[in-house]
């Protein structure tokens, strides 16, 4: 699969990613001990550089962030009193809960930070081989409130496509996301959302499901993995819907998908009237809509279970009202 952002091989079949994830970020026998730099120490007290391993070529995360801080100080965007945390958030290309600091190979890290410039981002990308993208962050990307419109971060250099290994009692999936357009969710075992979904499964309720604010598709696709016969995924934000279609393809073997059909190619970033963008069939009948959840059931058949996974603190009362046509609505 070609990456929709850079056209390269950033997106791999989920089963291949899962087969290699345990060793993806592991040190080799010749790697030096992790430097474990003090993240609160000012730049002036940090070492100038940390070498890569001569055998495997991988770099400790601290080495990459130190190199990035060096460039930002050099370009006047940080000063000698700033520390490693001031660089931004390091996001490994395939997110996975690690018990150890990651060792990074080429193009395996995205940096999302504030107060960055395009020239600095391009310098980081060209001079630090482990970095695959640099994002100017601020706020929560996506559509938090349909009345206020969307928020996007800015991809300053490189590629923003990354994936997360999502684990559950049903099995694991790899969920890819365009990170400058989709909010960050750190993968963790036993997450509250998965606990809710697993509880619904054990009550026999994950059979016919609408994931009304689906984002890149995490909950809806987990319902497919859990054995649902029909799943509808919907989002008002076009980048999320495009990520859903990508994730159907990436996870199709794990989900028992035999056929994926692309029906429409919407152009409006924020939808109003729902449009059926794609379908998939096999072990489960899957429909993907780009639309406002408040209007979804004018096009899609209601389900026995409707999941609403809104941003924390959002008022969901109106959405719950329109989802009354479903047998049960659960706020995740």
What is each residue range found by the language model?
Residues 230-236:
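Conserved SAM-binding motif I beta-strand of class I
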Residues 205-215, 232:
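Conserved class I S-adenosyl-L-methionine
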Residues 187-208:
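Conserved alpha-helix/loop element of class I SAM-dependent methyltransferases that forms part
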